[in-house]
Amino acid sequence: MPSDLTSKEYMRKSMTTMMMLMTSMFGCAACSSDGASKEAADVSENDNVPTDFQIQYTTPVPSEFFQAATQQGTIELVEYDSKDYTQSSRPATHKPAYVYVPYGYDPSKQYDVIYLLHGWTGVAEEYFLGRSGNSRTGLVHIFDNLIQRGLCRPFIAVSPTWDKDNRSKDWGESTREAAVFSQEYVNDLIPAVETRYSTYLTETTPEGILASRAHRAIGGFSLGSITTWYVFEQAFAYSRMYLPMSGDNWSQGMYGGAYYPDATAKFLADLVNTSPYKNDFYVWYAVGTEDVRIDQTHNQALAMAKLTDTFNVNTFSYHMKEGGRHDFNAVWEFCYHALQFFFPTNEASAVRSVKRESVATGRAYTLSGMLASGGRGIQIIDGKKIIK
């Protein structure tokens, strides 16, 4: 508490801050415009989290990975038809997906595929070519350098859009489209991309997509992370690897990871446990310590960590970027690390040495702490102070 405030004044200011935050938008890619105030009915803190569960802190991407590699992949546009899954009476839409094809692509070989989903107001091209659509981004340089330096086996990356028109929309329409993207993903996008390139998909039937699941990953940032969780919830079996960044699952309601983390985690665990692939999946969950969406991600992650029969070291890990905000700097760093884990050149090297922090002795990021400190509070578990 600041020294120039009395206890009552501090509590009053904290409560005012909390109410303002609960009834306004943060102006970020995963915020609601409904302004509804909710009660944190089921905030999951460090209680009952296994003492050996560790947050894994990512390290910055080396600066040379943002430089152009000598062996550069290409960015190609794939267009495909898809239904409007928000309303069956509407006509089919013609949609773009931008595809990173690695240097030295050989049609006689098979390639793993990762799909990366943009956040709210984003477009399909921005991950690889920027909003202008004409400049290779830092993420593409990272792809090139990871492959050229032998840190990843060559892979194909796809940047689609869950938006039927590939343009910025209001929050309500965007969330409706994100909620049904899993149908397009399985029915339209996977067949369109993975039959055009040499992948592990041999037929476009549901059985064929299932048969190639071990070589497929999907991830996303912000509302793209929420969409990734929708895919996990609605089409879990069709992808083996998941990379949700700065966003939660909404099966229990909007921002369910923040408000109802234990119920959310149980729902996800129950879903996994009814699948024949309950021991054959991986979630690489990530957020920045200064991200305005940390409450959604962190509370859900800790709740998932309690359910060790389902989410354990073989199927789940939780990562943080120190000082990371709700921006592409964090996304690039998470992708840099996750891709080495998903597609290692040597399977034995998939688990790499990283800075770790035990939840039992480390920090607790609680919803009440976030709100009382302007959405960015880091509450030390011993309760002595709040950082920033």
Segments predicted by a language model, with ranges:
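Bacterial N-terminal signal peptides that target proteins for export
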Residues: 4-19
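Sec-dependent N-terminal signal peptides
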Residues: 20-25
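C-terminal motif of bacterial Sec signal peptides marking the signal peptidase cleavage site
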Residues: 29-30
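Non-catalytic cap/lid and distal C-terminal segments of serine-dependent acyl enzymes
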Residues: 38-347
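Residue-level detector of functionally pivotal "anchor" positions at catalytic/ligand-binding pockets or at interdomain
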Residues: 345-370
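Conserved beta-loop-beta connector loops within the AMP-binding
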Residues: 371-376
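C-terminal tail/sorting-segment detector
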Residues: 378-388
